[in-house]
């Protein structure tokens, strides 16, 4: 790979470019060992960026944010794709490999509200902006007297809509707010047990072609092992459930010493039923744990989460 120039493909949002730059810095640390002369970032507009007024499930699902970038990777217009793992479908695209993950950012969910109120203090019938069924049902579990309304757009756009009184509060991921330096807006931070994050939340994934041996070896050096183990467990739950954008499922794993803890919840399609599991296993059985818990959830739910 002597004197090779590496092109990283990324969405063009402010947050996506922060993540891409973080990936670039990690790659540059190993560039000399692999004969890489230059690493540049290419901005790519995805369909998910273009369609801002509908749920992802209505316009193509999770792949809306990754598909366009993956096509450029397959066509060799870029060498590495940078994704927010939570936006990626559970099944790998043929010809590609996603096996490198940067150290996880804070996976928790946060509330930003008018007058800096906590969720418990919001007035009845307050309007909560959220982009996912999972968050909607999780909020309803805590406060069933609140109304959830779709909100799309980047973080700045969502905060602006809140300030324009279109919503009384919005739910976002801590990682995005923190990376953008907007922590001063946070009204409340939820623990991962109060609101279980989606699988892979807070994780940046690096993807390459599955036949690019030199880049595969480089990305092994960049990969964060404990993050890798945790998200494999979480993503296996999704794979077993064959989850899509309408699947309201939360999965969060954390490692404590030689043990991995996995907490999952699944809601029926209308959000009226909740199925919950928590279990631990030795770290070397993390992937198996995800599969087993996914199977148990599926059985408990009797497929009530599917259309």
Predicted regions and their residues:
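Short, structured active-site "lid" loops
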Residues: 53-79
